[in-house]
């Protein structure tokens, strides 16, 4: 190995936006765009594949998901860590999930902190980790014999409401709201997550002929409101409390919610969308995403637009426009239903261009900054004709997630490359973690000549390397085959909010 310390030029400088005639290319392939996939654990939808799988297989399968989506140039995973009053991590507030260990309340054997391990593996591959929780759903059915004695169904039976084949936490009870908030607080305090994520399950979807019996709570706490407004106020209060708690503990941790795709139909509210949805957020789930945005309680919203582009009752294209026009104070990403590809009664989903077309039209709205896809197994060794289209077009290049809303700032620090070495196999150098800062990643960019370096061009992204808590130095290794076209590289820092520093140029000139 040859030490090139005296022949390599190292320059730290401000890289201005250098478009170089690539404006159209950068618009087509944005540098910052949220690209996420949901990893559902409930009833083993995505992972673990079976609750009886051994730990080694579970780890291998999780890594396979990460590696698959890294190759597809995704940058975030939304992992379900609480689905039915259970947990994928050690806690006194809920039992271990049976979907992880085969028996509720039983820890993994051999023991490991599943959540901590998942976060480390996720960050090591450059992904954000969004911890997905279902706050109100307590069980999947009425078979309570499967529950641990430590489940809230047994510890607090007065918190439960029986409805539609499941048990739910009563959203009206202050003690329930406090308990669920404490669960969120514990995860934020203990784990290096990037976000807390709730999905569309607030009050349950209506079932004809069934009553969600919160009558006693309404009589006690209704305070003169209609039952509909009272239910919405219960959800709003919970969302507000969770938001305040997260930001009080770690202000860089995001709070995101993925609601049902229709706020209200225009037929009942002139502000609503041109849809004929059988149920809506506002009227049936008693969830009001517009209020959450207006009050700045959430960092991002991911409306679930699980319909085809021209669905007659809920058109993806019409709903996309509606959410863009009604967004405020909040990042908006769109939830896409990849699970419907080649499996839905709507035959539009048989067209391999449906998802690519949805991404294209999403990018045409400046108020929308990316997409999330349900769910992970959709592109895991299946639907390869769709993934081929994505990797050749929409997701040809890597992208960074968007900056946490309201947290855009200029980073005062810049990275420094040390111990620069090159050999026929690779070029290497070290980057040290800066003192008194919150830096998560080192970004590496490459171009053939110094004048061509443009950190706004996603085609120049070579790597994204995570700092580990126990290691304040990372080694950057650039294989020689990448340097054939990228003889010069630039490095930047990414902080915990997603802000990027100015760049340091590393010129491999012999």
PLM feature segments, named:
Residues 72-109:
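Aromatic-lined carbohydrate-binding/catalytic grooves of carbohydrate-active enzymes
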Residues 479-500:
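Beta-strand-rich modules
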Residues 87-102, 137-163, 200-222, 267-278:
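Aromatic- and acidic-residue-enriched segments that line the glycan-binding/catalytic groove
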Residues 286-312, 328-407:
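Substrate-binding cleft of secreted/luminal carbohydrate-active enzymes
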Residues 40-60, 131, 136-190, 283-287:
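Active-site-adjacent "subsite" loops/lids of carbohydrate-active enzymes
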Residues 60-86, 190-194:
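Catalytic domains of carbohydrate-active enzymes, especially glycoside hydrolases
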Residues 175, 179-183, 189-198, 202-275, ...:
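Active-site neighborhood of glycoside hydrolase catalytic domains
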């Amino acid at each position: 190995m040859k030490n090139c310390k005296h022949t390599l030029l190292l320059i730290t400088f401000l890289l201005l936006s250098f478009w170089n005639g690539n404006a159209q290319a950068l618009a087509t392939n944005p540098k910052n765009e949220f690209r996420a996939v949901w990893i559902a654990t409930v009833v083993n939808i995505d992972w673990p594949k079976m609750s009886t799988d051994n730990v080694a297989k579970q780890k291998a399968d999780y890594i396979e998901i990460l590696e698959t989506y890294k190759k597809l140039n995704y940058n975030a995973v939304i992992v379900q860590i609480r689905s039915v009053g259970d947990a994928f991590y050690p806690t006194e507030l809920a039992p271990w999930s049976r979907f992880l260990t085969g028996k509720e309340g039983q820890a993994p054997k051999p023991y490991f902190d599943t959540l901590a391990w998942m976060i480390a593996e996720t960050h090591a591959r450059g992904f954000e980790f969004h911890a997905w929780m279902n706050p109100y759903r307590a069980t999947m059915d009425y078979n309570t014999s499967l529950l641990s004695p430590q489940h809230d169904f047994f510890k607090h039976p007065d918190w439960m409401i029986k409805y539609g084949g499941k048990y739910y936490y009563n959203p009206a009870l202050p003690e329930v709201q406090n308990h669920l908030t404490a669960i969120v607080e514990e995860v934020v305090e203990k784990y290096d997550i990037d976000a807390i994520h709730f999905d569309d399950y607030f009050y349950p979807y209506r079932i004809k002929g069934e009553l969600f019996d919160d009558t006693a709570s309404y009589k006690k706490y209704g305070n003169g409101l209609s039952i509909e407004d009272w239910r919405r106020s219960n959800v709003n209060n919970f969302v507000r409390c969770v938001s305040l708690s997260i930001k009080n503990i770690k202000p860089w941790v995001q709070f995101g919610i993925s609601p049902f795709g229709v706020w209200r139909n225009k037929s009942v509210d002139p502000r609503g969308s041109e849809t004929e949805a059988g149920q809506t957020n506002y009227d049936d789930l008693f969830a009001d995403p517009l209020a959450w945005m207006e009050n700045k309680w959430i960092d991002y919203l991911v409306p679930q637009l699980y319909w085809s582009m021209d669905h007659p009752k809920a058109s993806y294209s019409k709903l996309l426009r509606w959410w863009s026009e009604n967004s405020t104070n909040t990042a908006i990403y769109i939830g896409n239903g990849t699970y419907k590809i080649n499996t839905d009664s709507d035959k539009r989903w048989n067209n391999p261009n449906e998802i690519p077309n949805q991404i294209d039209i999403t990018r045409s709205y400046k108020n929308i900054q990316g997409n999330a896809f349900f769910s992970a197994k959709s592109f895991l060794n299946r639907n390869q004709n769709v993934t081929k289209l994505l990797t050749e077009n929409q997701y040809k290049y890597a992208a960074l997630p968007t900056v946490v809303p309201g947290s855009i700032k200029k980073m005062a620090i810049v990275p420094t490359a040390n111990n620069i070495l090159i050999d026929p196999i690779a070029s290497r150098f070290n980057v040290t973690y800066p003192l008194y800062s919150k830096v998560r990643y080192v970004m590496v960019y490459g171009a053939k000549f110094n004048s061509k370096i443009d950190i706004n061009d996603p085609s120049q992204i070579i790597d994204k390397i995570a700092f580990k808590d126990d290691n304040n130095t990372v080694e950057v290794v650039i294989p020689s085959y990448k340097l054939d076209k990228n003889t010069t590289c630039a490095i930047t820092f990414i902080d915990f909010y997603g802000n990027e520093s100015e760049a340091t140029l590393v010129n491999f000139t012999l």
